[in-house]
Amino acid sequence: MGTMAGSWAALLGHLVAGNDLSAEDTAWAMDLVMTGEATPARVAAFVVALRAKGETPAEVRGMADAMLSHSRPLEIRRRAVDIVGTGGDRSGSVNISTMASIVVAAAGVPVVKHGNRAASSKCGTADVLEALGVAIDLPPEGVRRCVEDLGIGFCFAPVFHPAMRHAAGPRREIGIPTAFNVLGPLTNPARPSAGLIGCGDQRMAPVMAEVFAARGGSVLLVRGDDGMDEITTTTTTTVWVVQGGTVTEESIDPAEFGIGYSTPAELQGGDAEVNAEVVRRLVAGEAGPVRDAVLLNAAGALAAFEGPGTDLRGRLGADVERVAAAIDSGAAADLLDRWAKRSTEIMRESE
């Protein structure tokens, strides 16, 4: 156990004095949040005091590990990649990570996507997949079958993390971003070894990268320099490259890959039906700013899966061509169609 674990008063006093906690301390606190033993006041005090001090990688890792220990397990037998952002970047953009997931799987790399309904936007991953006919709330065995059969599956956060309901009230009432906002990408129940992970919060992005490094994953942690929680096409993107337990920081520019700059308005989304239509047009081969953004993010996920190595730009350039081919061959459209049908069949069988 950590030095503070066992006493809320000691733990909160330590934080308020500006001192860091150990991973064991935050895991102890998170464990009580997940079991419902922590009162709403203690939940709120804990995450607000952490935010005021500034969360460390060890503190966030302790929370994420405790959350995973309470999740419903999902064993995927294949290496896979996750493509997900923290959300909350207020950009109101189309579902770029969702589209990139479909394209990456169509290019032959297994994807296990972790996500939820919209929090700050009009349309989250779950909302757009539901509008596309994908059964979003499959149990663990159903998600596993989807990945085995199709190379893609979606873990709906409320299905896999039911214990997080105890934090819902305090999260909503606090109304400011806290460590809870970055836990989603760190708690994919399939625990994929690779990821393209977006974080719009400039201070938290390198903290998240260090958590992934401590786990030994191969991850590109990205933040658009416009504040988007993905690789942006409106300007440059900062990339924290996580491989071999270390983190290095790079900057990439869409122009390096023959992609022109777009405006935020060109990536603007709407409700689930509007964004679903954008997905359909993307997989049908429509050119333009949305495709450009999807290609870069899909290439980033492939690079993370393959291991970015020492030449990130060279890797991304080759992968942009590979993911473009997955759209233009019709493979992405075919996969989306099969995913909707197969997930619905599996859902019926598991009812």
Swiss-Prot record:
GO BP terms, alphabetized: L-tryptophan biosynthetic process
Subunit: Homodimer.
Main enzyme class: transferase
Entry binding sites for 5-phospho-alpha-D-ribose 1-diphosphate: 85, 88-89, 93, 95-98, 113-121, 125
A GO CC annotation given for this chain: cytosol
Cofactor(s) needed for function: Mg(2+)
HAMAP family, per database record: TrpD
Cofactor binding: number and manner: Binds 2 magnesium ions per monomer.
Binding site for anthranilate 1: G85, N116
Residues that hold anthranilate 2 according to the record: R171
Binding site for Mg(2+) 1: S97, E230
Record organism: Saccharopolyspora erythraea (strain ATCC 11635 / DSM 40517 / JCM 4748 / NBRC 13426 / NCIMB 8594 / NRRL 2338)
Name of the protein described by the UniProt record: Anthranilate phosphoribosyltransferase
